[in-house]
């Protein structure tokens, strides 16, 4: 039975991924890293004594906590970190958390005796390539990284991605996620919504598709040439709805 270490499991994408992985608990042991907040402890309480789930209470910025999660893992799904709108209100903290988390993931993986066998999945962001204003509406994975210097979230994702891909980890992949469409998204009212240019375009990814992605990337049928590449992630043409 393989062990999957998942960070960010209590966030939108991470939770969807965890639920999909949990359906495969007869084949995978699931290890989660979560901050011991009241919200997280309540959310994960039903799994506290589940033999298929191991919860590491800790923080991405603490190397020992990250190492406890990585040790013995076959896959590392690094979804955790600070995202908008919190990232917009706390830009410097976002930079520190997201970069330090990537550094700790790399350090922990390379410290393992079986480091070459551990596959690392990093969740990046299409924000790394900047806004898609006319006439450049189409994004490709080969496009240059072009983050706004004032968008600390985007900058942090660029730096963190480079830390992962240039680390010497033998098998990695960067999945640059777009905006996640999840139930209740319209209830999140924040002035940061106006940071999105009115003439920009966006192809959403549903939270369900995002969860299936995380659960499928750990399957044996994933081809070898999938690894050591960059991918843009979305739910397809039918989700080109709004900016």
Q: Which residues fall in each region the model found?
A:
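Conserved Rossmann-fold NAD(P)-dependent oxidoreductase catalytic core, especially the SDR/UDP-sugar
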Residues: 100-150
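Conserved beta-loop-beta element that borders a ligand/cofactor-binding pocket
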Residues: 161-183
């Amino acid at each position: 039975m393989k062990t999957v270490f998942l960070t960010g499991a209590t966030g939108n994408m991470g939770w969807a991924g965890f639920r999909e992985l949990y359906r495969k608990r007869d084949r995978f042991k699931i290890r989660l890293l979560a901050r011991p907040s009241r919200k997280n402890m309540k959310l994960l309480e039903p799994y506290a004594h589940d033999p298929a789930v191991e919860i590491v209470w800790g923080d991405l910025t603490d190397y020992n906590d990250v190492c406890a999660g990585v040790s013995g893992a076959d896959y590392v799904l690094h979804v955790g970190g600070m995202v908008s709108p919190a990232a917009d209100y706390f830009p410097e903290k976002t930079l520190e958390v997201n970069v330090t988390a990537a550094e700790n993931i790399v350090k922990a993986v390379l410290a393992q005796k079986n480091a070459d066998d551990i596959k690392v999945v990093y969740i990046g962001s299409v924000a790394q390539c900047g806004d898609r204003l006319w006439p450049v509406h189409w994004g490709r994975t080969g496009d240059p990284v072009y983050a706004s210097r004032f968008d600390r979230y985007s900058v942090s994702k660029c730096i963190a991605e480079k830390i992962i891909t240039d680390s010497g980890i033998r098998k990695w992949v960067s999945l640059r996620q777009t905006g996640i469409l999840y139930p209740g998204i319209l209830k999140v009212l924040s002035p940061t919504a106006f940071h999105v240019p009115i003439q920009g375009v966006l192809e959403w990814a549903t939270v369900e598709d995002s969860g299936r992605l995380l659960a499928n990337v750990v399957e044996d049928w994933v081809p070898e040439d999938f690894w050591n590449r960059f991918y843009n992630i979305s739910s397809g043409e039918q989700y080109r709805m709004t900016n």
